[in-house]
Amino acid sequence: RLMQEIRLLQRTEGREVEEPFQKGQKGSSAMPHKRNPILAERICGLARVLSGYASTAEYNIPLWHERDISHSGAERVILPDSTALVEYMLLKSAFVVENLQVHEKNCERVLESTHGLLFSSRALLTVTSSAKISREDAYAIVQQAAMETWANPEQGNLRQRLERHASLSAISKADWDQVFDARSFLTHIDGIFGRVPHPPTPSP
């Protein structure tokens, strides 16, 4: 799943991140400009092989009577192959993550290209609680503003359209600042990273 996300984020039109690209490495034999995420692609492909092995293991469950050995031949293939594949995939995944290139300006550009639409859920909650209108009416207001933003972003982003709405005059600028603050999505980031296991510190 992580490698698939990296592949998606490395697309040319976004280029938010890139897996490590070694000097002299070729991304394509025919197109010298390409920097394909070959490691992430390889890991995604091997994950399909592992999925097939897992299916084989499930077929090994029903055995005849006390126990036959129909599972044995399959296990002799899937067990050593699976463990070797998992180790290889983990090592390559660690290499990709440790050397991942993050293009912050491209990330900001992609976020800005949404014209504030990614904050629609937060806007809905604020409109419902601060404007003292029903959730159904709040949803209709935010949705209409969002659809208009999709169609004509040059005439105003989502925030500008909501601030102009007559029914939302009770919502202050400070409230809108909080709604459209991208840092709000990082509120729990320390806790998320805290759940990631870290290798033990080697003894001196």
Regions found by a protein language model. Give the residues of each.
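Catalytic cores of enzymes that engage adenine nucleotides and/or redox cofactors via long glycine-rich
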Residues: 1-44
